[in-house]
Amino acid sequence: MGNIMDGKSVEELSSTECHQWYKKFMTECPSGQLTLYEFRQFFGLKNLSPWASQYVEQMFETFDFNKDGYIDFMEYVAALSLVLKGKVEQKLRWYFKLYDVDGNGCIDRDELLTIIRAIRAINPCSDSTMTAEEFTDTVFSKIDVNGDGELSLEEFMEGVQKDQMLLDTLTRSLDLTRIVRRLQNGEQDEEGASGRETEAAEADG
């Protein structure tokens, strides 16, 4: 699938943006390498359901472009640049990668249903006019052109862009505004943090 940024790089960001993001990144992650645990802690993603935890792990993996188990500064900037400045096509490619849990280049019903359930568990404000099962059925009935029960990247890209309802729903359900706001403002979830961290550690153990 190639680079999901499609050529977008740090050079396209202003020096001010890069400096601010670097300062925040190094403040939160002095080692220069963000682990999955730190990723979850920074965004206040604690005490998650199994579905929500899987979604967070999958999101982390899609931002870990070189697959070394860490998010470094370049990957961090690429991820933020995608969210803040990415075009529809670039975001759809990222959505596809997020849904393609096993990384085989196709999305099957179980993968889509799992991520939709996870998104709703972590973001209750997302669109809920349909159940996760109904939304999954709708997606496949509309854009699984060859009817093989799997969505290729081409089917996903073309189908979603042709259907405004699907595009709007996906955009709302994968709204990363909260995460971006935390990164931009350097906000920390201080209230009750120590107690939740203890609970999270116990849950992870």
From Swiss-Prot:
<dbReference type="GO" id="GO:0016020">
    <property type="term" value="C:membrane"/>
</dbReference>
<feature type="binding site">
    <location>
        <position position="68"/>
    </location>
    <ligand>
        <name>Ca(2+) 1</name>
    </ligand>
</feature>
<dbReference type="InterPro" id="IPR011992">
    <property type="entry name" value="EF-hand-dom_pair"/>
</dbReference>
<dbReference type="GO" id="GO:0009966">
    <property type="term" value="P:regulation of signal transduction"/>
</dbReference>
<dbReference type="GO" id="GO:0007601">
    <property type="term" value="P:visual perception"/>
</dbReference>
<feature type="domain" description="EF-hand 1">
    <location>
        <begin position="14"/>
        <end position="49"/>
    </location>
</feature>
<dbReference type="InterPro" id="IPR028846">
    <property type="entry name" value="Recoverin"/>
</dbReference>
<keyword id="KW-0472">Membrane</keyword>
<keyword id="KW-0966">Cell projection</keyword>
<feature type="binding site">
    <location>
        <position position="148"/>
    </location>
    <ligand>
        <name>Ca(2+) 3</name>
    </ligand>
</feature>
<keyword id="KW-0449">Lipoprotein</keyword>
<feature type="binding site">
    <location>
        <position position="66"/>
    </location>
    <ligand>
        <name>Ca(2+) 1</name>
    </ligand>
</feature>
<feature type="binding site">
    <location>
        <position position="102"/>
    </location>
    <ligand>
        <name>Ca(2+) 2</name>
    </ligand>
</feature>
<comment type="function">
    <text>Stimulates retinal guanylyl cyclase when free calcium ions concentration is low and inhibits guanylyl cyclase when free calcium ions concentration is elevated. This Ca(2+)-sensitive regulation of retinal guanylyl cyclase is a key event in recovery of the dark state of rod photoreceptors following light exposure. May be involved in cone photoreceptor light response and recovery of response in bright light.</text>
</comment>
<feature type="domain" description="EF-hand 4">
    <location>
        <begin position="131"/>
        <end position="166"/>
    </location>
</feature>
<feature type="binding site">
    <location>
        <position position="75"/>
    </location>
    <ligand>
        <name>Ca(2+) 1</name>
    </ligand>
</feature>
<dbReference type="GO" id="GO:0031282">
    <property type="term" value="P:regulation of guanylate cyclase activity"/>
</dbReference>
<feature type="binding site">
    <location>
        <position position="155"/>
    </location>
    <ligand>
        <name>Ca(2+) 3</name>
    </ligand>
</feature>
<dbReference type="GO" id="GO:0071277">
    <property type="term" value="P:cellular response to calcium ion"/>
</dbReference>
<feature type="domain" description="EF-hand 2">
    <location>
        <begin position="51"/>
        <end position="86"/>
    </location>
</feature>
<feature type="binding site">
    <location>
        <position position="104"/>
    </location>
    <ligand>
        <name>Ca(2+) 2</name>
    </ligand>
</feature>
<keyword id="KW-0106">Calcium</keyword>
<dbReference type="GO" id="GO:0008048">
    <property type="term" value="F:calcium sensitive guanylate cyclase activator activity"/>
</dbReference>
<feature type="binding site">
    <location>
        <position position="146"/>
    </location>
    <ligand>
        <name>Ca(2+) 3</name>
    </ligand>
</feature>
<feature type="binding site">
    <location>
        <position position="70"/>
    </location>
    <ligand>
        <name>Ca(2+) 1</name>
    </ligand>
</feature>
<dbReference type="GO" id="GO:0120199">
    <property type="term" value="C:cone photoreceptor outer segment"/>
</dbReference>
<feature type="binding site">
    <location>
        <position position="144"/>
    </location>
    <ligand>
        <name>Ca(2+) 3</name>
    </ligand>
</feature>
<dbReference type="GO" id="GO:0007602">
    <property type="term" value="P:phototransduction"/>
</dbReference>
<dbReference type="GO" id="GO:0005509">
    <property type="term" value="F:calcium ion binding"/>
</dbReference>
<dbReference type="InterPro" id="IPR018247">
    <property type="entry name" value="EF_Hand_1_Ca_BS"/>
</dbReference>
<feature type="binding site">
    <location>
        <position position="150"/>
    </location>
    <ligand>
        <name>Ca(2+) 3</name>
    </ligand>
</feature>
<feature type="binding site">
    <location>
        <position position="64"/>
    </location>
    <ligand>
        <name>Ca(2+) 1</name>
    </ligand>
</feature>
<feature type="domain" description="EF-hand 3">
    <location>
        <begin position="87"/>
        <end position="122"/>
    </location>
</feature>
<feature type="binding site">
    <location>
        <position position="111"/>
    </location>
    <ligand>
        <name>Ca(2+) 2</name>
    </ligand>
</feature>
<keyword id="KW-0479">Metal-binding</keyword>
<keyword id="KW-0519">Myristate</keyword>
<dbReference type="Pfam" id="PF13499">
    <property type="entry name" value="EF-hand_7"/>
</dbReference>
<protein>
    <recommendedName>
        <fullName>Guanylyl cyclase-activating protein 1</fullName>
    </recommendedName>
</protein>
<dbReference type="GO" id="GO:0030249">
    <property type="term" value="F:guanylate cyclase regulator activity"/>
</dbReference>
<dbReference type="Pfam" id="PF00036">
    <property type="entry name" value="EF-hand_1"/>
</dbReference>
<feature type="lipid moiety-binding region" description="N-myristoyl glycine">
    <location>
        <position position="2"/>
    </location>
</feature>
<dbReference type="GO" id="GO:0031284">
    <property type="term" value="P:positive regulation of guanylate cyclase activity"/>
</dbReference>
